[in-house]
Amino acid sequence: EELFELCDRVTVIRDGEFIETRDTKDWDNDSLITAMVGRSLDNQFPKEFGQKSAEPVLKVENLQEGGVLFGVDFEAYGGQILGFAGLVGAGRTETMRAIFGADPIDGGKVYIHGKEVSIKNPRQAINNGIAFLTEDRKGQGLVLAQTIRTNLILANMKRFCNGPFLNEKKIVESGQEHIKSLRIKTPSIDEIVGQLSGGNQQKVVIGKWLNADADIFIFDEPTRGIDVGAKVEVYNVMNSLVKAGKCVIMISSEMPEILGMSDRVVVMRGGKVMATVDRDSKHFNQEDIMKAAWGGTLDG
């Protein structure tokens, strides 16, 4: 949007190569996206629907963290994407960090498959089937100085061990499978992750958590800083998880992304849940969700 509003001419560079320059008036959104990704994208948000589980996979009651979270309640189901919307500082990331055991909580209960759990650290969260793709992939999601091979196994190293030793054959086979299925552009599984583009780094993070065999996948700003083509590939991963019956939670500051991919949306403000909106609700639109994010009440 900023390009069309501010620029006189637009140049597209893809994979380090010059593609095309045109006057802005000669571009439209579709042609620009096609030039950026090298192929036509018929649907920017390829939403697919899974079978909603009968009971919530994750249930949170009265979650509290001093000065940050004030009685957060929500339910997340298998076979669905639960979107979290809100302004910066609304408490969305803080809620997920608390559930994941990255930050201590002062009160509240967390249930997974109907059983109350006490999660004090990320390892306990992983053992309880939670995967957390953080918004800071470089600082918290990856070891940039290490290879793709190493990063892919970090969430579940036991899966790749024979006794006390790593099974290198299994690591390579799994890594090559993820490179192919996630379309990671790399010359080798031994490429240093820090040398990859942002979109390919994000795919490595996703591959790492797919190896964790989780039931609950938390995506925090999953498409921030990646190109349009890579975004669609991330959405397709979410779709495959949903169709496999997994519980997917997506935090996003992009309203079209929230509306395009979510089955339900939790709206937060100031560490509290202001509204929960189903996809078939009359309030499932940008205006009403933003109204709730600003503290307004949704009637009916």
Model-assigned labels for residue ranges:
Residues E1-G300:
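Glycine-rich phosphate-binding loops of nucleotide-dependent enzymes
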